[in-house]
Design a protein with these regions (language model features):
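Extracytoplasmic gate region of multi-pass secondary transporters
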Residues: 34-36, 267-330, 389-393, 397, ...
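Multi-pass alpha-helical transporter architecture, strongest
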Residues: 214-222, 362-370, 457-487
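Cytoplasmic helix-loop-helix junction between adjacent transmembrane helices
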Residues: 141-181
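Primarily marks hydrophobic transmembrane alpha-helices of the MFS/SLC 12-helix fold
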Residues: 84, 138, 349-352
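Helix-loop-helix hairpin linking two adjacent transmembrane segments in secondary transporters
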Residues: 180-229
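C-terminal transmembrane helical hairpin of 12-TM major facilitator-type secondary transporters
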Residues: 345-395
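C-terminal ends and interior cores of transmembrane alpha-helices
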Residues: 89-131, 353-371
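Residue-level signature of mid-helix packing/kink "hotspots" within the transmembrane helices
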Residues: 32, 61-69, 150, 184-185, ...
Length: 487
C-alpha cells in the first residue's frame, strides 16, 4: 500500500472499535452495581451473608455460561447488527429490573416498606424469609442481565474479525476489552454516590439506561465493511489484506468458505476449540472474583467500604492500573510480529506467557497488606494481577480469529465464554461458602499463618495467582503450532 493510499484511507473501523469499547464499559458498569451496593445497602436490607451473595454471583456465572453457549450462534444467525442490538436491549432491561426487588420482596413478605424489612431482628425467621425471597428475585434479575450480556463479546469479536486484519485484531480487542476495566474504574466513583443520594434502586436504573442510549448509535453506525458508506476502497483493502495470504494457503490445502457456518457440536471436535475453552475456564473466574469481591474485601479487611472516599479510591486505583497496563496486551504481540518477524500466533502465545506471570502478584496481596496494615498495597498488587488478565484475555480472544473462519468465530467465542462462566461459577460459590465458613470459624480456621476470613482470602488469591500459568501450559500442549481449522 503506497503512501498516498495510506493518507487517503478512512478509519471507520476505529470508530466502531470505540463503540465496542463503550458497549463493554456499559456491560461492566451494569455488572458492577451489585458488588458496589452489596455490603452497605443490599446486605443489611435483605439480611444476606456472603454465602447468599456467592450463590447469586455463581448463578449469574452459570446462567451467563449457558447463554454464551447459544449467544455466539445467535449472533451468527441474526447478524452482527441485529444480534448486538437485541443483546444490549435485554441486558439493559435486566439491569433496570433490579430496582424492583426491594418493593417486590416487601410485598411478598408482607411488609409495608423496605425500612420495615431492615428493622427485622437479625437471625429471626422473618429475616430468613426476607433473605430467601430477595435472593430468588435477584436470581431472576441476574438471569435476564446474564442472558443479554452473554452476547456482548461474541458480537464484538465478530466485528473485529470483520473490520481488522489479523495483525491488528489483538490491539483492537485490547482496546474494546479495556472497556471492562474502564467500567470497573468508573463504577466506584459514580455508583456509591448515586446509591447514597438517590438509593441503590436508582443506581441500577440510571446505569441500566445507558445501554438504551448506546443502541441508538449502533443502529445508525454499523454496516458490514463492504456495505458501509464510511469505508473507502483504501480502508477496505487494508481490512482484507490477509486475503492474499489465505489464497496462497488454499493452493496447498483447500480452505473452507470464510463465511461458512459450523454447528455448535462440531466445534467441540477441534483441539483449537478446547485450547480456547481451557484458557477461559481457568482464568475468567479470576477476573470475576476481583470484580465481585474486591469492594467487600477492602471493607472487611481494611475498614474501607465504598461509602467512604478511601474505599472508592482503592477500587478506582485498582482498575486504573488495569486500564493502563492492559493496553499492552494488544501492543506486545504486534511488536513481536512487526519488529521481530514472528508469526501472529507465535507472538500471541509468547505474549500470553509473559502476561501469565502478572497474576502472581496476587499471592503477595494479603501477606503484604496485613503485614504493613495498608489497603493500598493489595490494591496495587491486585490491579497488576487483573491487568495481566485483561492483557491475557485480549490475546486469548484473538486466537479464535487466527484459527477459525469468520462464520464460526461468534459460535466458538460463545463456547469459550460458556467455559469461562462455568469456571467462574465454581470460584464464586466456593468463595462465598469459604468466606462465610471462615468468618464463623474465626481463629479455628487457619491457612499459611492467617486465621479466619483473612485465611479465606489468601486461599482464593493463591488460586488466582497460579491459574494463568496452568492454563498456558495446557493450551500450548493442545495446539503447539499455528494450525487453522479446516471445515
Amino acid at each position: 500500500m503506497g503512501e498516498t493510499q495510506k493518507k487517503l484511507m478512512t478509519n471507520w473501523r476505529w470508530w466502531l472499535c470505540s463503540l465496542l469499547f463503550v458497549a463493554t464499559t456499559v456491560n461492566y458498569l451494569d455488572r458492577q452495581v451489585l458488588s458496589l451496593t452489596y455490603e452497605n445497602f443490599i446486605k443489611p436490607e435483605f439480611h444476606w451473608n456472603d454465602d447468599n451473595y456467592g450463590t447469586i454471583t455463581a448463578f449469574f456465572s452459570i446462567f451467563y455460561a449457558v447463554a454464551c453457549l447459544f449467544a455466539g450462534k445467535f449472533v451468527d444467525w441474526m447478524g452482527t447488527k441485529k444480534g448486538y442490538l437485541i443483546a444490549i436491549g435485554v441486558w439493559s432491561a435486566g439491569a433496570c429490573l433490579h430496582a424492583a426487588t426491594g418493593w417486590a420482596t416487601a410485598h411478598i413478605a408482607g411488609f409495608d416498606s423496605t425500612a420495615a424489612m431492615r428493622a427485622v431482628e437479625i437471625g429471626s425467621n422473618a429475616a430468613l424469609t426476607i433473605s430467601t425471597i430477595s435472593v430468588y428475585l435477584f436470581l431472576l434479575c441476574r438471569g435476564i442481565l446474564a442472558l443479554g450480556e452473554a452476547g456482548n463479546f461474541p458480537a464484538a469479536i465478530k466485528v473485529t474479525a470483520e473490520y481488522f486484519p489479523k495483525k491488528d485484531r489483538a490491539f483492537a480487542t485490547s482496546i474494546f476489552n479495556a472497556g471492562a476495566s474502564v467500567g470497573a474504574l468508573a463504577a466506584p466513583l459514580c455508583i456509591p454516590p448515586l446509591a447514597m443520594k438517590f438509593g441503590w434502586e436508582m443506581a441500577f436504573i440510571i446505569i441500566g439506561a445507558l445501554g438504551f442510549i448506546w443502541m441508538f448509535f449502533w443502529a445508525f453506525m454499523y454496516e458490514k465493511p463492504e456495505q458501509s458508506k464510511h469505508v473507502n476502497e483504501a480502508e477496505l483493502a487494508y481490512i482484507h489484506q490477509d486475503d492474499a495470504e489465505e489464497a496462497v494457503a488454499e493452493k496447498t490445502a483447500p480452505k473452507a468458505d470464510d463465511e461458512k457456518q459450523v454447528s455448535l457440536w462440531k466445534c467441540f471436535t477441534f483441539k483449537q476449540t478446547w485450547q480456547f475453552i481451557t484458557g477461559k475456564f481457568f482464568t475468567d473466574g479470576v477476573w470475576w472474583f476481583f470484580l465481585f469481591w474486591a469492594p467487600s474485601y477492602f471493607s472487611n479487611q481494611f475498614n474501607a467500604p465504598v461509602t467512604t472516599p478511601l474505599g472508592q479510591w482503592l477500587i478506582f486505583t485498582l482498575y486504573l492500573i488495569v486500564t493502563v497496563v492492559s493496553i499492552g496486551g494488544g501492543y506486545l504481540p504486534k511488536l513481536f510480529v512487526e519488529k521481530k518477524g514472528m508469526h501472529p500466533y507465535t507472538g500471541r502465545m509468547l505474549a500470553m506467557l509473559i502476561f501469565a506471570f502478572f497474576p502472581l502478584c496476587a499471592l503477595l496481596a494479603q501477606p503484604l497488606g496485613m503485614r504493613f496494615n495498608s489497603a493500598w498495597i493489595p490494591a496495587i498488587l491486585i490491579g497488576l494481577a487483573a491487568a495481566g488478565h485483561q492483557a491475557w484475555s485480549a490475546n486469548l480472544f484473538s486466537t479464535i480469529g487466527d484459527m477459525f473462519p469468520k462464520g464460526a468465530i461468534a459460535t466458538v467465542t460463545g463456547v469459550g465464554a460458556m467455559a469461562g462462566g462455568v469456571g467462574s461459577m465454581f470460584i464464586q460459590k466456593i468463595a462465598g461458602k469459604l468466606f462465610t465458613y471462615a468468618e464463623n470459624a474465626g481463629p479455628a480456621f487457619r491457612f499459611m499463618g492467617f486465621e479466619g476470613k483473612p485465611a479465606g482470602y489468601f486461599i482464593m488469591f493463591c488460586f488466582c495467582g497460579l491459574a494463568y500459568l496452568i492454563a498456558w501450559f495446557i493450551m500450548k500442549s493442545l495446539v503447539p503450532k499455528y494450525k487453522p481449522v479446516e471445515l
